[in-house]
C-alpha cells in the first residue's frame, strides 16, 4: 500500500458516490468512493480540492483510503 500520496480531486459525483483523485506525482488517477469520504468525516469532495491519501489495491484496482484534506 502506498501512503501519504498528495493529490487533487479531479472530479466527484455526489449522486453516484464516487470520483477520481489526480496524483501530484504523475501517477494514475485513483478511484475514491463515498465510504472513504465518510470514514474521513467529510461530507463530499470538491473539484481541485487538495487531499492526502493512501492507496489500497483491491482485486487489481487502486482505491483511495485514509483520506485527509491538505
Swiss-Prot record:
A Pfam family recorded for this sequence: CSD
Record-linked CDD domains: CSP_CDS (cd04458)
Subcellular location: Cytoplasm
Xref: PROSITE patterns: CSD_1, CSD_2
InterPro entries: Cold_shock_CspA (IPR012156), Cold_shock_domain (IPR050181), CSD (IPR011129), CSD_CS (IPR019844), CSP_DNA-bd (IPR002059), NA-bd_OB-fold (IPR012340)
GO terms, molecular function: DNA binding
Transmembrane segments: none
GO-annotated cellular components: cytosol
Domain of life of the organism encoding this protein: Bacteria
CSD domain: residues covered: 7-67
Keywords: Activator, Cytoplasm, DNA-binding, Transcription, Transcription regulation
PANTHER family: COLD SHOCK DOMAIN CONTAINING PROTEINS
Name by which UniProt lists this protein: Cold shock-like protein CspA
Amino acid at each position: 500500500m502506498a501512503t501519504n500520496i498528495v493529490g487533487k480531486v479531479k472530479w466527484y459525483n455526489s449522486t453516484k458516490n464516487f470520483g477520481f483523485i489526480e496524483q501530484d506525482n504523475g501517477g494514475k488517477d485513483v478511484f475514491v468512493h463515498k465510504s472513504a469520504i465518510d470514514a474521513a468525516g467529510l461530507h463530499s469532495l470538491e473539484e481541485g480540492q487538495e487531499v492526502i491519501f493512501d492507496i489500497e489495491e483491491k482485486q487489481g484496482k487502486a482505491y483511495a483510503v485514509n483520506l485527509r484534506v491538505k
